[in-house]
């Protein structure tokens, strides 16, 4: 069984969760418990060290890895500045690069993301860049020092599933780096499909936070991710155009 190691840390639970869109900060602790997640993303603007009631960190256990994102950055320079602030505020060395200048579809800018990744990796950050799935950009992110890459399945927050499935599969097959499917996953079955493809992990936020029962939805995604990974490691049987009997069709009545 392959281990998922990022930044020298073994990640045993391959479901990453986000912290946005929940009805209250208090529910996040229960979602983390239900999902078993070791990694949670958060926007820096939700960290308020001067107001504990509004500070999201008060609801995140100390053993959970913080993955602050650079939400709001429209270019590499802004992403770099946000990452440095996050580390200075005590959020650690992990950073999810988000560089989005497209306000309609919220698609990440791969070129600016590569620039930010290079600078931050050189500064000792564990960089996980959010990207449009592309084999060439993936290779350049690896060269820039990314610890993993996070291609989108569909536009962020859309719950539309794996619309970029074939492009993600190419990245899984060709890149020697953890591929974490991020954005667009709307159902546990879609997370399972991503894991069956060989994704190293899935990051889910909107699908859990916008459900009527986020805690049970977190549990559902946990089971789906575990099942999909187990199926991938078990090496699924080949598909066939024709029927193939599982029991002998001859000999019994001869």
UniProtKB/Swiss-Prot annotation:
One of its GO terms (molecular function) is thiazole synthase activity. It is an enzyme of class 2 (transferase). Its EC number is 2.8.1.10. Its main location: cytoplasm. Pathway: Cofactor biosynthesis; thiamine diphosphate biosynthesis. GO terms for cellular component: cytoplasm. CDD domains: ThiG (cd04728). The keyword Cytoplasm applies. It comes from the Bacteria. InterPro entries: Aldolase_TIM, Thiazole_synthase_ThiG, ThiG. Pfam families: ThiG. It is found in: Cytoplasm. It catalyses: [ThiS sulfur-carrier protein]-C-terminal-Gly-aminoethanethioate + 2-iminoacetate + 1-deoxy-D-xylulose 5-phosphate = [ThiS sulfur-carrier protein]-C-terminal Gly-Gly + 2-[(2R,5Z)-2-carboxy-4-methylthiazol-5(2H)-ylidene]ethyl phosphate + 2 H2O + H(+). Keywords: Cytoplasm, Schiff base, Thiamine biosynthesis, Transferase. The active site is at residue 96. 1-deoxy-D-xylulose 5-phosphate binds at residues 157, 183-184, 205-206. GO terms for biological process: thiamine diphosphate biosynthetic process. Catalyzes the rearrangement of 1-deoxy-D-xylulose 5-phosphate (DXP) to produce the thiazole phosphate moiety of thiamine. Sulfur is provided by the thiocarboxylate moiety of the carrier protein ThiS. In vitro, sulfur can be provided by H(2)S. Homotetramer. Forms heterodimers with either ThiH or ThiS. Belongs to the ThiG family. This is Thiazole synthase. It comes from Clostridium perfringens (strain 13 / Type A).
């Amino acid at each position: 069984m392959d281990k998922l190691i990022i930044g020298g840390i073994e990640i045993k639970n391959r479901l990453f969760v986000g912290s946005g869109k929940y009805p209250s900060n208090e529910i996040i602790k229960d979602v983390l418990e239900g999902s078993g997640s070791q990694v949670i993303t958060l926007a820096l603007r939700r960290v308020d060290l001067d107001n504990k009631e509004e500070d999201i960190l008060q609801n995140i256990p100390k053993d959970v890895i913080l993955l602050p994102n650079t939400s709001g950055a429209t270019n590499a320079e802004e992403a770099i500045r946000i990452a440095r602030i996050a580390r200075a505020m005590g959020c650690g060395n992990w950073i999810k690069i988000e560089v989005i200048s497209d306000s309609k579809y919220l698609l990440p800018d791969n070129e600016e993301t590569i620039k930010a990744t290079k600078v931050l990796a050189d500064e000792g950050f564990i960089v996980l860049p959010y990207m449009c799935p592309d084999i060439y950009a993936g290779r350049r992110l690896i060269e820039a020092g990314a610890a993993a890459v996070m291609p989108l399945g569909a536009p962020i927050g859309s719950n539309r599933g794996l619309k970029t499935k074939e492009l993600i599969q190419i990245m899984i097959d060709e890149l020697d780096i953890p591929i974490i499917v991020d954005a667009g996953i709307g159902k546990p079955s879609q997370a399972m499909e991503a894991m069956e493809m060989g994704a190293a992990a899935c990051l889910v936020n909107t699908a859990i936070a916008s459900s009527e029962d986020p805690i049970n939805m977190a549990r559902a995604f946990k089971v789906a991710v575990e099942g999909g990974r187990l199926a991938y490691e078990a090496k699924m049987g080949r598909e066939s155009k024709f029927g193939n009997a599982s029991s002998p069709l001859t000999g019994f009545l001869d």
